[in-house]
């Protein structure tokens, strides 16, 4: 690798403080409206969608524990790795939601952009009886499914922290059913990827997940730059 000249624009690396994500508090009026809806929720579901830089794991996990809600984590949410063992984070739902649809939620709380999962987007559009809440930065409205959500404008961490103070609790067994289905699907996928067979490219992801240390960064790309 060749370092660029010191006066080249690409040689500048901003200090860490310049890379911090701006924090926006949640408007009190919007929070009061969402809190009143959340108090009556008995089947809450949290969707962690794609987000530049990843979503804040600790505030979302605290919120999930407080509400008794499962978190469906998109691959681009940043929540599929680095979370404690036993955290209510689901990562295999794309493999089972279509064939084993769960009881529909009555409250859907989505952070970030729309999920990349086609089946999850279809279900979101079909859960018309549920209350949909979209947490997005001020001025944002990343909602392609036509659910007409209540928008809670603010930073994900601020919104999760504020909602964790709402006295709400899911019905018994609600989160457990989601977790059991997802754990079973994950175990089946892992077992299938390790079965003796001809070369299976997908196995590399299973092995990397087990081998990489927490917080590791994996850089992946295609071969075009090499060929070019």
Sequence positions of predicted segments:
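Active-site donor-nucleotide binding/catalytic segment of nucleotide-sugar enzymes
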Residues: 37-53, 182, 190-199
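Thiamine diphosphate
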Residues: 116, 226-228
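Glycine-rich phosphate/diphosphate-binding loops that line cofactor/substrate pockets in enzymes
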Residues: 31-44, 63, 207-214
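Glycine-rich, anion-gripping cofactor-binding loops and their flanking helix/strand elements
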Residues: 32, 48-133, 141
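Conformationally flexible catalytic loops at phosphate/diphosphate-handling active centers
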Residues: 1-39
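Active-site regions of enzymes building and remodeling cell-envelope glycoconjugates
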Residues: 13-17, 83-95, 130, 145-157
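Structural motif
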Residues: 43-45, 107, 217
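Phosphate/pyrophosphate-binding active-site segments
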Residues: 123-226
